[in-house]
């Protein structure tokens, strides 16, 4: 439930020790948080909340928070550090050490963020707030199970500050 999420869960001094753990990648519903929902022709919120595009459900929207601590060395701080999310349904905010880094929506496309400027030597806190529905959920309504969470791999890439990138 969005209303029950602590506003400051991503802050450095917020204590997350009492939180449940969940595997990443996985879906909340498969792990017992919420109910899996199959949808074919009807939007999952039809009859439960009266909304029109481009707005996302609010009353029935769910959210989940993830926290991960990583250690960064002095040598790594002298490089470019990227974090990659290969799949998150349906949208999310990324925080590093209490600062918002960015936002992404598109469940099935990868998202990459440069977190270099947010890191410190030693322990770093990464926070991710994932929402079950967003305005892009109107476009993702297909014949499939609607599940939420970080359902594909997440990884760090550490590169030299000057490097070659392939693009098309």
Where on the chain are the PLM-derived regions?
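Accessory beta-strand-rich segments of carbohydrate-active enzymes
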Residues: 1, 5, 27, 35, ...
